[in-house]
Amino acid sequence: MKVTLGVRTSAGTTGAAAWEIRAAATPGRARLLELGFFLAAATASQYGLGRPQAIGDTPTSPVDFLPEDPNDVITAALIQSALAWGTGPTVPLAYLRRIYLPATIGTGVIWTFPTGIVIPVSGSLVLWNIGTNGVVDAYAVVDI
């Protein structure tokens, strides 16, 4: 089943997560198939996609990803989005992808992963602010 969600990030602080995609303990591994994000402010920005050393703790307002097919039945909190936390995720040791975007509103990227990047059980992937960044409009497609 494919689930998706679009968000606007709220934090552009250097060395912090802009967005976390979190998987629950069930139904098992999820796979990120596509991630796109586009600058919503004219700020040169540098982002990385990676697995944090530790997931964020106590997300303040997690949002469930939505099924692409409205007939699919999905349990709450299987795949969630987090933009703020009691304690944020920690920096990835390495990045699966990284990009530098010029200070032009609407500039962005769509990363596709044909076989999917695994989001570990009870783990996450983060879009990481490598530099001081502007906010972005972002979306992700995940297969569960």
Model-flagged regions — what are they?
Residues 1-144:
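Surface-exposed, low-hydrophobicity beta-strand/loop segments enriched in small/polar/acidic residues
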